[in-house]
Amino acid sequence: MSTQPESASPPVPEPVEGPGPITAGLTSDRDTIRAELATLSTEQVNERHPDLDALSTRELVAAMNEDNRSVPDAIAAVEPEIAEAVEAIVERLRRGGRLVYLGAGTAGRMGILDASEAPPTFGTDPGLIVGLIAGGPGAIQQAVENAEDRDDLGRADLESLSITADDAVVGVSASGRTPYVLGALEYARSIGAITIGLSCNAGSPLARDADIGIEAVVGPELLTGSTRLKAGTAQKLVLNMLSTITMVRLGKTYRNLMVDLLTTNEKLRARAERTVMLATDVDAATAAKTLASVDGWVKAAILVLVTGIAADEAVARLRGGDGSLSAAIAAHAAEDPTGAAPDVH
């Protein structure tokens, strides 16, 4: 018998009342929607495994693994668009803007997942990368009826964040036709924010209407229409690229090391020490002592050990510059080209 109190169960979200206006010529007429869905590659029947329910467990595992192999190829085909999106996001964040993901269902959850990982991984403010889902926080665990059909809700959610022209808004939708997402991007564009549309179908309204369209076409799902599968995987991989490469470009890493991670538990404190050891070739005791002198900031500890400057000066240099450890090390070397420093290679 469970020992969890009944109050621990998540509340059941309330249905969203009434259909809202639909953008981009889409309609709420069911016959028309069926016709639209029939044109989407993600809604087609996967002819490789039409007898899914007749396969053994081992065969199902092999079939699913085989089907997933198309995802990296789909993403490789849109690498130029992903790079363009990253550059646009970096430019906005350097201006003091934010990165906002939004979507419905799986797409919304993928954005929230990626956004939630940024603070512990890169030491960012929780408000820098934000994830929105149609229907609000309750929809993370349970679907909210009709929410994705409301383009006005997408607009309202962005308005609640006081979106500005300095922000980057990424709409995520496997079909590329979700009204909630289209309405949000229409509003974002109207105020000058850069808009990026991530879809898993070619020729989607989302990619067409966004400033930058990314169409990772993964094809029919193993389970017909279940876009939490390949489409969801593709969305997660692309969002990984958008956030991670953006953080690299913003100087939140040193080589391929996490130097702005938040040390909020023992595992992360051990990782911080190991990161300092990898970057500077010092022992664990030295790494721990140096980290303590800079309040656990990995980036500052490495700067102290590489350059030999005092802890407070290292912190001041990083906070006074653009935050790039490589740039801070290079600047110190330019000031004191004959100064000896530990071999960090």
State what each model feature region is.
Residues 2-3, 23-74, 78:
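Cofactor-/ligand-binding subdomain signature composed of acidic, glycine-rich
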Residues 3-30, 343:
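Intrinsic disorder/low-complexity segments
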Residues 42, 63-71, 131-142, 254, ...:
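Gly-rich Lys/Arg/Thr-decorated short loops/hinges at beta-loop-alpha junctions or inter-strand turns
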Residues 77-92:
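A short, well-structured juxtamembrane/interface segment
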Residues 80, 142-143, 231, 263-265:
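Active-site pocket-shaping loop/turn-to-helix segments
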Residues 99-241, 246-250:
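Glycine-rich phosphate-binding loops that contact phosphosugars or nucleotide phosphates
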Residues 246-345:
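Short, amphipathic alpha-helical interaction segments embedded in low-complexity terminal/linker regions
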